[in-house]
A protein has these predicted regions:
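Glycine-rich phosphate/diphosphate-binding loops that line cofactor/substrate pockets in enzymes
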Residues: 111-122
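Internal, active-site/partner-interface "lid" segment
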Residues: 254-263
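HTH-adjacent hinge/linker in prokaryotic transcriptional regulators
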Residues: 6-10, 20-27, 35-38, 43-111
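Short, mixed-charge aromatic SLiMs
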Residues: 70, 165, 262-263
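Basic helix-turn-helix/winged-helix DNA-binding cores
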Residues: 14-18
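Glycine-rich phosphate-binding loops that contact phosphosugars or nucleotide phosphates
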Residues: 120-242, 247-255
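N-terminal intrinsically disordered/low-complexity leader segments
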Residues: 1-5
Length: 263
C-alpha cells in the first residue's frame, strides 16, 4: 500500500498507522484500530478487503509476528543474520561463492535460451514472486527495460492474482520462487489456503527455482533450475546472475528493427 498509494490517501494513512503500531494489532478490536487511525470502522473493513483479507478479523488474526510467517524452513534472520552474528561473515561469503560455482557447473542453458526467445515474441509479460523473489521480479523489470523490453510486475498480491487470472495464451508468466511454494500456496493469509490460480491460467509459465519438483507441475511450461550446495539461502544472488544471462540472450536473439526506405 505504501508503495502504491499517494501519501495523502486514507489507505496510505491507515497502512502507515498500522505499521507504526504493528505489535498491538492482534490485541486490538476494530473499534480500537478505527480510533487509532481516526477513521470509521467501515473504512477499516474496506481497507482490510482491499489488501486481500475478508474482513478486519482475518487481518488481525494474520498480524501476529513470526519469522516463519510464510512457512519456510529457512528464513532470513535464522538462516543468514544469526550465523553471521555468531560466526562472522566468512562462511556466508564462502557459501555464496560455492553456490554460484555450482550454478556455473550445473546450469542448463536450454531453458534460459527458450525463455529469452519467448521474450522476443511475447508482448504481454508478467514477472512475480514473494519477498526476495518479489525483489528479483522488480529487478528483472528494470534489467529488461535497459534492453528495451518492458514487462509487468506488481507487489500487490491481489493485482498479481488478477493479472494471472486474466492472462490469455498470448501472455508469458515468469515466476521467481526459490522453494516453489509461491505456485501452490496463497501466502498472504495465516492459514495459507491452497492456491489454484496458476492451474487455471492460460498463460505460458516459466519458473526460476531450486525445487526440482516444479518440473512436474502440469501448468508449468519450463523451469530454470539452480542448485543449493550450502546451508545458506543464496538465491537472491543466483537470481541476479540468471537474470543477467537471460537479458544477454534476449539481446542476442532480438532481431534488429528494419527501416523502411519506401517513400
Amino acid at each position: 500500500v505504501l508503495n502504491n498509494e499517494t501519501t495523502s490517501s486514507t489507505y496510505y494513512h491507515i497502512a502507515q498507522t498500522l505499521l507504526n503500531n504493528y505489535s498491538i494489532i492482534d490485541k486490538s478490536s476494530i473499534s480500537d484500530i478505527a480510533t487509532l487511525c481516526t477513521v470509521s470502522k467501515s473504512t477499516i473493513s474496506k481497507f482490510a478487503r482491499s489488501i486481500g483479507f475478508e474482513d478486519y478479523y482475518e487481518l488481525k488474526k494474520s498480524s501476529t509476528f513470526a519469522e516463519n510467517k510464510y512457512h519456510f524452513d529457512l528464513n532470513y534472520i535464522s538462516n543468514i543474520i544469526n550465523p553471521i552474528e555468531k560466526n562472522g561473515y566468512d562462511d556466508y561469503l564462502d557459501a555464496i561463492i560455492k553456490d554460484i560455482s555450482a550454478f556455473k557447473q550445473q546450469s542448463n542453458m536450454r531453458s534460459i535460451d527458450e525463455l529469452a526467445k519467448c521474450l522476443t515474441t511475447y508482448n504481454k509479460v508478467g514477472a512475480f514472486g514473494l519477498l526476495f523473489s518479489e525483489s528479483a521480479a522488480i529487478d528483472f523489470q528494470y534489467k529488461l527495460a535497459y534492453a528495451g523490453k518492458f514487462i509487468i510486475t506488481y507487489q500487490s498480491d491481489l493485482k498479481q492474482i488478477e493479472f494471472i487470472e486474466q492472462a490469455d495464451e498470448e501472455t508469458l508468466l515468469i515466476i521467481f520462487s526459490n522453494s516453489g511454494g509461491f505456485l501452490q500456496r496463497q501466502q498472504l493469509r495465516d492459514d495459507i489456503p491452497y492456491r489454484n490460480v496458476f492451474e487455471n491460467t492460460k498463460a505460458k509459465i516459466f519458473v526460476i527455482t531450486a525445487n526440482e519438483e516444479v518440473r512436474n507441475y502440469r501448468f508449468v511450461h519450463d523451469v530454470i533450475l539452480f542448485p543449493h550446495e550450502t546451508i545458506f539461502q543464496t538465491h537472491s544472488f543466483i537470481y541476479q546472475i540468471i537474470m543477467d544471462i537471460i537479458v544477454s540472450k534476449y539481446r542476442q536473439y532480438l532481431e534488429p528493427p528494419t527501416i523502411s526506405h519506401k517513400q
